Amino acid sequence: YYFNFVQGEYFKEAEPDAKADATKKLAPRALWWFRWGAMFTFLTGLYLLWMLGKGVNQYIALGALMGIFMFLNVWLIIWPAQKIVVGITEGDAAAAAPKALRASRTNVLFSGPMLWGMFGSKHGSYDTGGFDSIAFGDIGFLIPLLLILALEVNGIVGKVGPMASVKGVIHMSVLLTAVIFGLVAFL
């Protein structure tokens, strides 16, 4: 959230010298923690998912999928693009920055429904019976799954659209949470 809510907004207002200094000295350090924080979260998430065993249901399956996409966005899109932006590697910073922004905003978008999936896994309306019990062909699971996949594709090659602002991405995350888990619960 730091990059979306704090650093990005600061860079919009910063003097050129201050922005250049932060890009050179602060951003690489913050990106290191961001990247390895994503790795730790991913690995602990897999471990906790494995520990749930028979406690897995549609909610946590969708939340886990979004968590996996968030991890992949950090390591395969955001980090490589940001290395170019901050000058660690050669490349077109003007082309790399929008890629990082789209993936980063997609991660914020997925944060709300992913968190809801974690809560819903124990407090949702579905019985738990492990991955074998998830009705992957159920329309109430399939539509949210396809929506998540479409949003991830948009995060890779699309446009930020209403997620261009911090306020917009927060509102979109709340809306996505309501839509996904409304579909899971009522279809």
Regions found by a protein language model. Give the residues of each.
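Polytopic transmembrane helical bundles with strong interfacial aromatic enrichment
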Residues: 1-187
